[in-house]
């Protein structure tokens, strides 16, 4: 999908998008990894979902790691506070696949066409890498008060 959207110079386009948003970007792996397995592990993390999802995003976009590789998935999950045995248990089967597919369908119905994309308050879509201020404006319009520390 990224190659179709950005053409053969995808790496430069993604880096430019991140630079414009003020986000760090690493050289991405030569092949776009299938992140489904990492996403299932993140879902399994329960209350730590956001923290683990962020770790996987930072690992891929910020450090150029292959988040489709089981060992990378396990290392990042352990660093995010999960235990190795439970992570390998998720990877050994199809646990949480139904949740992932359901959430993916919901995102598509909301208008998401790629990653990164955020759905806020169950319906407001923020597509692409965006500066922090965009999220602040969206939250304010939805009646939320952004945290003082940003």
Map each language-model feature to its residues.
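Structural alpha/beta surface segment adjacent to cysteine/selenocysteine redox centers
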Residues: 1-63, 145
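C-terminal cap of thioredoxin/glutaredoxin-like
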Residues: 47, 51, 55-150
